[in-house]
Amino acid sequence: MRPSYPTTPGTFQVDLRGLVDLLSRHLYRSPDVYVRELLQNAVDAIAARRRLEPGVAGAVEIEVVEPADGPPTVVVTDNGIGLTGTELVELLATIGRSSKRGELAQHRDFIGQFGIGLLACFLVADEITVVTRSARDPDAQALCWQGRADGTYDITPVDSDLTAGTRVHLRARTGFEHHLTRDHVLALARRYGGLLTLPIRLGSVQVNNEPPPWDFPALTMEHGRESALAYASRVLDLDPLDAIPLHADGVRGLAFVLPYEPSPAARQDHRVYLRRMLLSESADRLLPDWAFFVRCVIDADDLSPNAARDGFIEDERLARVREQLGRGIRDHLKDLARLWPARLAGIVATHDAGISALAVHDDECLLLFADWLPVDTSLGRMTLGEHARRFGELRFVRRFDDFRQVAPIAAAQGRCVVNGGHVNLSTLLERLAVLRPERRISELDPTEIVDSFADLTAEERSEVADLVRLAETALRSHDVGVQVRAFAPSQMHATLVTNEDSRFRRQLDRTRSVVDGPWSGVLAALPTASAANSQLCLNVANAAVRELARQARQGSIMRVRRAIELLYVQALLLGHHPLRDRELGLLDDVVLGFVEDRG
């Protein structure tokens, strides 16, 4: 009995139309890449011929035919190496193999790296016609290869005026006519091939007549910098703060400092070329993560493009280039610090987060940039350099909440306290304290603010004794101590001073109140730290507090108690401390008591 399956070797049957649809949806971002693929094949073919005939002058001609009664046709002609009949069969007819694959594997002066080749042209055409004549044989006959979207093809000899080289004809698919119109093809040719060195023409129009930005005069010269900034405005629609020259192994380009502060998590949209052919206008992962404040334009010789040809493969070469480009940006900023400090000041004012991220890992950069880093203080925003000139010693608090707590009091006292709650800032200040001990940089404990308040006289302590006793009774269940001091600003009734342990306990209590299930048991088992260092400091310089002291002496116990509870909740809110359930209930009870005019 004969088996129901073939017993001889077979080949996979490829649904070409389905494969093209897959490419269009998942590999290529736009069918417009067909122009890039045609230009790439032409450039590669000319590079191959130059290896055979070093003196040949390469050229690429594009023609667009737009008949009144039919779809447009695009014709791309090059005077490259051409193809023999054997190559047509072995290469063009084999899905997944580039028409230049063998040579591409051997020579770095070719752009192409993948066997997508003419397959991309099926994104916009149902039929591709290739007329070619090989330069390897002076007697070679011109051949015509016709491939169709159903996966069939045929090869025939033809009479053609084509000398050595290749001519590709594409006729627009239904629904894709716009992609093959003259204006659209011209725009795409300029976009993808505008920086290629080979002359490319569409009819009488020279497509590539602009020098690449990395060939501008040295950016240390003002006219070179102006040319680079003008390029960014014209091509990238960007008005950058500065232009930075980039150099790495086989890579050259420019980095433009953004005129706004992007999110560190934002995608880096860089413009990348491979041997002057545009690959992508939205590539990322080219620079270190800290360099999110620049957008670059680069050209690479040896980096490997990914399958979609819209970026580079993440490999050791790209990692090395990324490190080198980051070093170049860092060195440029160092040069600005020495030579153009005003320019650097403008950059740091906009991108202090990125500069800080760089300085965290580089002591030299920290020393260079420290004086330009802006900080928020109790006396307003200023640079660290300005702070050093005005105040000498620098005191900072580590947390935003601590800064909110101490800032109004410190400002009223004329003290300049730095908010170290911003990303990396506390780390930078601690490191700067080690590198520059003469700057006298140290962390401020918020309790030091209370310690700086003037002590009361014996008479004043006697006047507020009843108030302190009532306040301690009212707040005992909240584990809060009470002090009375006189401090500025007099408009502040009270301030709540906490330490790390009391903040942890407050957050733990708040979490316990909203968590149930297995985690509630875990939280219940956690040890509870003492909150003895949480202190409500009443301000006797405030008229309302003095009135409460008077009423306490007169025995208005309930009214004073309600007022103390209200001042406690107010201090919590002003200090941005999380309210626990019992404090929310306390606030509700206090408000209700005043509404009902109890006590």
Predicted features along the sequence, with ranges:
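GHKL (Bergerat-fold) ATPase N-terminal catalytic module, capturing the glycine-rich phosphate-binding loop
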Residues: 1-188, 588
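GHKL/Bergerat-fold ATPase module in large chromosome/replication-associated machines
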Residues: 110-112, 131-152, 173-178, 183-599
